């Protein structure tokens, strides 16, 4: 079936998108395309062919049938209008409804209904202008829908996909191979139920609001392009965001059976390299999932829920020497993860371990100065001198928070870095605060996860390098770094 879908989309693209002559006679050009398709075994018919004074061509009652009726495309009308301003540019429109029929000898007949309101597709380089400095492509539609038209389809049990306020633009600069694009959607609705012979059953009913995508890249596979991003010679970025989303889905395959429903308040992914700086941000807002079935490779879990407030990854750094130390940041945060009792009960039915939310947060910043020679990066990385890669002036712990099973670990502190010794050496202090760890260790012993002897050794080691805190089950340790060595509350640590 995938082959036939590809054939259908290819046929549509070829019928109005393949240049055969460098000329702006769109009427003659379209005749040549139809003739070429006919010579390859396709059957093309239409009730009327209207050629306008503006050079436009409208095919009314359009029907394109591939050899052996494998793919049939039917539309009330298809129209192309050449630009009066940009040579070779053509704008295409389609009747509000069209039907694509795929006759697959293996999976049967699949009927796909395509509906649209205000669909407009504009492409450069159609009848001429293929060598223009910049080629552009755009798609606009108030709405665009794809549904199944065969209630007895053995594969597509249900299909209803809808795009609202679609806007997409792409430009390609031929000399530099610069590819720039932007896509926007007010909403995306997806309802499908697919019974695939090899993959299994895939079903989902969901929607997402306010989808945005933008990118700028050099469209080649030359490894030097990456060096251009890092050196600041070229700007590249990928930015994606989505608003509130919800879905109910099933995945039934030979390896897994998963059924769930979930919601999310939003997602952001951004990667940018510009002017000698690199920044990566990934963030997922409040998310909740409920799994009614979860079985992978014959290992089932009971129905369970999982939720979290935030997942965030943030990394930013200069990549070239701008003449002074500059701030770099690294953050990984998973906040307030809550898992339902049904999962805990699998290994701790007696509730020996506290059911507190899980947090894992590390947020660091540093002042750094990169020294990599991006014209010959191997020389910098293989010199054996860390200073040829870069220098670190200081490091600050903005936040460390780890919680699980009633225990909590926090840390704060900072250190300055001496780069004169042939390797970076820190001088400073980090204060660790550990609370609830005795209760967690006792719980792990109670459920048999760790032996009592090992638990005692671990607690004894911690007490040797920590002092009692304000609470009954709380310990504090000051880790100090100096040229004389590393100590914990004044006790030298083995090096």
Model-derived features: positions:
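Gram-negative bacterial Sec-dependent N-terminal signal peptides
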Residues: 1-22
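Glycine-rich, small/hydroxylated-residue low-complexity segments
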Residues: 23-495
């Amino acid at each position: 079936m995938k082959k036939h879908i590809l054939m259908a989309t290819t046929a549509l693209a070829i019928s109005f998108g393949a240049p055969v002559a460098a000329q702006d006679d769109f009427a003659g050009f379209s005749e040549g395309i139809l003739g070429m398709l006919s010579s390859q075994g396709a059957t093309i018919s239409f009730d009327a062919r209207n050629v306008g004074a503006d050079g436009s061509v409208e095919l009314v009652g359009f029907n394109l049938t591939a050899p052996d009726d494998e793919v049939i495309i039917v539309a009330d009308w298809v129209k192309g209008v050449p630009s009066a301003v940009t040579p070779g540019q053509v704008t295409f429109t389609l009747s509000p409804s069209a039907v694509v029929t795929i006759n697959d000898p293996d999976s049967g007949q699949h009927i796909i209904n395509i509906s649209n309101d205000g669909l407009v597709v504009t492409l450069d380089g159609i009848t001429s202008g293929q060598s223009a400095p910049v080629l552009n492509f755009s798609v606009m539609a108030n709405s665009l829908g794809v549904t199944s038209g065969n209630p007895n389809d053995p594969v597509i049990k249900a299909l209803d996909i809808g795009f609202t306020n679609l806007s997409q633009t792409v430009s390609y600069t031929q000399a530099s191979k610069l590819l720039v694009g932007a896509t926007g959607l007010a909403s995306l609705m997806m309802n499908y139920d697919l019974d695939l012979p090899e993959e299994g059953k895939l079903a989902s009913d969901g929607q997402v609001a306010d989808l945005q995508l933008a990118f700028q890249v050099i469209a080649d596979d030359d490894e030097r392009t990456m060096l251009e991003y890092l050196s600041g010679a070229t700007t590249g970025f990928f930015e994606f965001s989505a608003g509130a989303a919800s879905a109910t889905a099933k995945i039934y395959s030979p390896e897994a059976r998963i059924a769930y429903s979930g919601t999310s308040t939003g997602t952001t992914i951004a990667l940018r390299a510009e002017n000698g700086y690199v920044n990566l941000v990934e963030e997922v807002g409040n998310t909740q999932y409920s799994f009614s079935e979860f079985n992978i490779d014959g290992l089932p879990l009971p129905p369970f829920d999982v939720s979290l407030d935030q997942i965030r990854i943030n990394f930013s750094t200069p990549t070239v020497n701008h003449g002074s130390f500059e701030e770099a940041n690294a953050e990984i945060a998973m906040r307030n993860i809550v898992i339902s009792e049904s999962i805990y009960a699998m290994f701790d039915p007696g509730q020996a371990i506290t059911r507190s939310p899980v947090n894992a947060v590390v947020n660091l910043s540093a002042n750094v100065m990169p020294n990599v020679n991006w014209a010959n990066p191997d020389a910098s990385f293989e010199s054996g001198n860390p200073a040829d890669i870069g220098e670190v002036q200081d490091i600050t712990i903005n936040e460390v928070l780890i919680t699980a099973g009633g225990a909590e670990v926090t840390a704060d502190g900072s250190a300055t870095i001496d780069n004169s010794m042939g390797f970076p050496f820190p001088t400073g202090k980090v204060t660790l605060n550990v609370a609830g760890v005795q209760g967690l260790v006792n719980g792990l012993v109670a459920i048999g996860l760790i032996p009592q002897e090992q638990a005692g050794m671990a607690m004894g080691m911690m007490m040797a390098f920590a002092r009692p805190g304000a609470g009954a089950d709380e310990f504090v340790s000051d880790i100090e770094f100096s040229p004389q060595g590393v100590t914990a509350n004044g006790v030298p640590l083995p090096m």
